[in-house]
Amino acid sequence: MQKEKRAIVVGASSGIGFEVAKLLIEQGWIVGVAARRVELLQGIGATAVERIDVTSDDATEALGLLIKKLGGMDIYFHASGIGKQNRDLTEGIELATVQTNGVGFTRMIGEAYRFFARQGYGHIAAITSIAGTKGLGPAPSYSATKAMQNIYLQALEQQAHSRGLNISFTDIRPGFVDTALLSGDFQYPMMLRPEKVAKDIVWAISHHKHIRVIDWKYRLLTAVWRRIPRWIWRNIKL
């Protein structure tokens, strides 16, 4: 008999995380969900629910409780993150972004890695962003923390391989997605629907893709970005 597959989605209260959790449940996964706003998780149909604030010191303990409620964990999916344009470099926005996307990300991904190392296998997938490709002046801390996330996942993948650990990694890099994260007066180009992005994410996870840029337009865009010299990039007005 095939073993039941168990996934935990952190940051499942809205947007991409919510859609991925729903899709996994529809596909027969045993799913545990977590977020700061647990009241938004009740109708999702998950097997287990836990309140987790990734910026809190007790977040790893809460993850452990969720794993116990679920009866194990085969995939850890990290969808928790914040981001704002901050052209005035407001200190509070910069530091809050680093706290969630930097410290919180490291805390949760690290705990999942240690759990899978003890277990002997596992799969870590996380939403990062195409914003980590280059330094984006309108959103300095967001861009910088996304680059950090890209490199952190790559570093852990290299470490796991060198240690002989059976841990897979999938770095999900969406373009602009129509979620609350990008709500406001500014109209972003080439917006993606979260439902479409979720399908692409679940496909990438099931095929054990190392990096998945979503979608083809953003794969083309980031390929061009990488080739722009620094002296040209700094003169581009975004």
Predicted regions and their residues:
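Residue(s) in the substrate-gating loop at a strand-loop-helix junction
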Residues: 129
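N-terminal Rossmann NAD(P)H-binding glycine-rich loop of SDR-like oxidoreductase domains
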Residues: 13, 21
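Rossmann-fold cofactor-recognition segment
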Residues: 45-58
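Conserved NAD(P)H cofactor-binding loop of Rossmann-fold oxidoreductase domains
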Residues: 77-85
